[in-house]
Structure formats: C-alpha cells, structure tokens
Amino acid sequence: MEKLTILLLVAAVLMSTQALMQEQRQKAKINLFSKRKPSAERRWVDVGCTFLLGSCTADAECCSDNCVETYCDLWW
C-alpha cells in the first residue's frame, strides 16, 4: 500500500510539472506573437506611407516600397 501511495504521489508531481512546462511554452508563444504585432501595425495602421495606387515619387513613400512611375504598385 505504501508503494502505491508513493507511486501516485510521484505521478501527481510529474503531471503537475509537465502541465507547468506546457503553460510556460504557451506563454512564450503568445509573447512571440505579441512582439511581432507592432511592426505590422506600424506598417499599415500608423500609415506614414502611401497605399496601393496612391501618388508617389520614390519607393520609400509607398507601403509596398514599389513606386512605379507616379503611383504605388504591388510588391512584385
């Protein structure tokens, strides 16, 4: 009976440790995604650049970095 109790305690500790490690991994993934979000927001929401078919004189003025003649074009 003592061996069974010890075995159950060890199993409970291992399961709780595994659950804690999974939770930390999931939080790390969430942090990774949240770090990427501002760069996308800066590019499209904060504007500061001209969208597709807007007038431009240089590549740097376009959100796509592609000024063709006098308007912003797609990336390719």
UniProtKB/Swiss-Prot annotation:
Residues annotated as signal peptide: 1-19
Query: What tissue specificity is annotated for this entry?
Result: Expressed by the venom duct.
Q: Which domain of life is it from?
A: Eukaryota
Question: Coiled coil where?
Answer: none
Q: Which InterPro entries match?
A: Conotoxin
Localization (cell): Secreted
List keywords of the entry alphabetically.
Cleavage on pair of basic residues, Disulfide bond, Ion channel impairing toxin, Knottin, Secreted, Signal, Toxin
Please provide, in alphabetical order, the Gene Ontology terms of the cellular component aspect for this entry: extracellular region
A GO term for molecular function: ion channel inhibitor activity
**In the UniProt record, does the keyword Membrane occur?**
no
Q: Which residues form the propeptide?
A: 20-41
Which residues are connected by disulfide bridges in this protein?
49-63, 56-67, 62-72
How are the domains described in the entry? The presence of a 'disulfide through disulfide knot' structurally defines this protein as a knottin.
Q: What does this protein do?
A: Inhibits voltage-gated ion channels.
Give the record's family classification.
Answer: Belongs to the conotoxin O2 superfamily.
Task: Write down what this protein is called.
Answer: Conotoxin Vc6.9
Q: Which organism is it from?
A: Conus victoriae (Queen Victoria cone)
